């Protein structure tokens, strides 16, 4: 059993209503801590009441309250609909309209969950904010370090790369050394009804999985048809709006050709989707921006060999990074990688440790 310090310290738990955060609340309560549960209502409550496989939906708020009542701990629901729309949903929509492939869960952790929940936890006099993420905080020579969860199948470090050093010092991740099965067994041991609740699968504010309808609702008429052009320069047809295409996409292009074609570039300024053979997807280097760095500072002209992940589901790849300025880095793969998508995160690792990361720009070669 993981122990988070002195008995009777106050710890706020970010309770989503799922099995992970519920198990954390129960675990800390059993250890004798003064646990306070907080759940954020992030989007249209009525739309999501029946949605059970998303995060922070109406059913999940009910489940979080039910768990808190069983444990006998205080529980608060904070209305964050306006903040969530402004910081996450609008960003998600605008990213697609800019020809990018957004990552709303990272934006939510950065702009809403960690920033504001930590502020609230401090106001409540809590010593820590605990979450149900599968990552580890390790005390290094220069302070807290962010490490991958021990269970590679559940590791969530890719989604937490924007966590700052200051935030990391205040956060705790009790499940980082556990597997999902172990967490479910803990929840069963505590008698929690959510022990067998399915994991969230979808983007929480896209309850039916149709992100295009969300975009069209928020920015009606913003996505117009345009040209599909082969990377060799000739026109192949017309696309139905750039929001319908992502880098690496092969199906649903609506064009006929004598070899398989993939989306290799999206130009939002001229409203063009470029396609080409699979070989055109191969990338050697690219630029990332809005860097969050958790390790020792990289010197100017220094080249550092690391591992990077450009999608949460892809394994890390060897690469060389170098600092361009305080907000940009160049990432060069040691061997070519396929389908690097602007708008996605590039997270940088040294073994199990997260060194930092940034957002992939259009500067891809």
From Swiss-Prot:
Catalytic residues in the record: 108 (nucleophile), 204 (cysteine persulfide intermediate)
Cysteine disulfide partners in this protein: 108-204
Binding-site list for ATP: 14-21, 40, 132
InterPro entries membership: MnmA-like, MnmA-like_C, MnmA-like_central, MnmA-like_central_sf, Rossmann-like_a/b/a_fold
A Pfam family recorded for this sequence: tRNA_Me_trans_C
Lineage top rank: taxon: Bacteria
Gene3D superfamilies referenced in this protein's UniProt entry, alphabetically: Adenine nucleotide alpha hydrolases-like domains (2.30.30.280), HUPs (3.40.50.620), Translation factors (2.40.30.10)
Catalytic reaction list: S-sulfanyl-L-cysteinyl-[protein] + uridine(34) in tRNA + AH2 + ATP = 2-thiouridine(34) in tRNA + L-cysteinyl-[protein] + A + AMP + diphosphate + H(+)
A GO biological process held by the record: tRNA wobble position uridine thiolation
EC number: 2.8.1.13
Cell location: Cytoplasm
SUPFAM superfamilies registered for this protein in UniProt: Adenine nucleotide alpha hydrolases-like
Region of interest called Interaction with tRNA, as start-end residue ranges on this chain: 154-156
tRNA-binding found in the keyword field: yes
The keyword Transmembrane is assigned to this record: no
Site entry: Interaction with tRNA: 133, 344
Chief place of localization: cytoplasm
GO CC terms of this entry: cytoplasm
A single GO molecular function term of this UniProt record: tRNA-uridine 2-sulfurtransferase activity
Swiss-Prot/TrEMBL keywords: ATP-binding, Cytoplasm, Disulfide bond, Nucleotide-binding, RNA-binding, Transferase, tRNA processing, tRNA-binding
Task performed by this protein: Catalyzes the 2-thiolation of uridine at the wobble position (U34) of tRNA, leading to the formation of s(2)U34.
Protein family per UniProt: Belongs to the MnmA/TRMU family.
PANTHER family assigned to the protein according to its UniProt record, in alphabetical order: MITOCHONDRIAL TRNA-SPECIFIC 2-THIOURIDYLASE 1 (PTHR11933:SF5), TRNA 5-METHYLAMINOMETHYL-2-THIOURIDYLATE -METHYLTRANSFERASE (PTHR11933)
HAMAP family hit by this protein: tRNA_thiouridyl_MnmA (MF_00144)
Classification via NCBIfam families: PRK00143.1, trmU
Protein name: tRNA-specific 2-thiouridylase MnmA
Naturally occurring in which organism (per UniProt): Rickettsia felis (strain ATCC VR-1525 / URRWXCal2) (Rickettsia azadi)
């Amino acid at each position: 059993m993981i122990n988070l310090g002195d008995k009777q310290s106050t710890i706020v738990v970010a309770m989503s209503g799922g099995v992970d955060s519920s198990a954390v609340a129960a675990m800390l309560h059993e250890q004798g801590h003064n646990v306070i549960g907080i759940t954020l209502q992030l989007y249209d409550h009525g739309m999501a009441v029946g949605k059970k496989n998303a995060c922070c939906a109406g059913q999940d708020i009910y489940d979080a309250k039910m768990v808190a009542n069983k444990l006998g701990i205080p529980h608060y629901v904070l209305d964050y609909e306006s903040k969530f729309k402004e910081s996450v949903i609008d960003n998600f929509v605008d990213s697609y309209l800019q020809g990018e492939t957004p990552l709303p869960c990272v934006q939510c952790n950065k702009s809403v969950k960690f920033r504001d929940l930590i502020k609230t936890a401090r106001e409540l006099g809590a010593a820590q904010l605990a979450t149900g993420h599968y990552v580890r905080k390790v005390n290094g020579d220069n302070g807290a370090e962010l490490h991958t969860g021990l269970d590679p199948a559940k590791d969530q470090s890719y989604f937490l790369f924007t966590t700052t050093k200051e935030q990391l010092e205040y956060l705790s991740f009790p499940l980082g050394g556990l597997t999902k099965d172990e967490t479910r067994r803990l929840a069963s041991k505590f008698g929690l009804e959510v022990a067998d609740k399915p994991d969230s699968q979808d983007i929480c504010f896209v309850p039916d999985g149709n992100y295009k309808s969300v975009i069209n609702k928020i920015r009606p008429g913003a996505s117009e048809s345009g040209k599909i052009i082969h990377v060799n320069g000739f026109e192949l047809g017309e696309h139905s709006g750039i929001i319908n295409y992502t880098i690496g996409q092969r199906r649903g292009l609506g064009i006929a050709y004598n070899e398989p074609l993939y989306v290799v570039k999206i130009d939002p300024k001229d409203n063009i989707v470029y396609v080409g053979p699979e070989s055109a997807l191969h990338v050697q280097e690219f630029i990332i921006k809005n860097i969050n760095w958790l390790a020792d500072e990289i010197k100017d002209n220094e080249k550092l060999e690391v591992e990077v992940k450009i999608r949460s589901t892809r394994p890390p790849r060897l690469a060389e990074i170098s600092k361009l300025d305080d907000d940009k880095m160049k990432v060069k793969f040691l061997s070519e990688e396929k389908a690097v998508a602007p708008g996605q995160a590039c997270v940088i690792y040294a073994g199990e440790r997260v060194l930092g990361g940034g957002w992939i720009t259009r500067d891809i070669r």
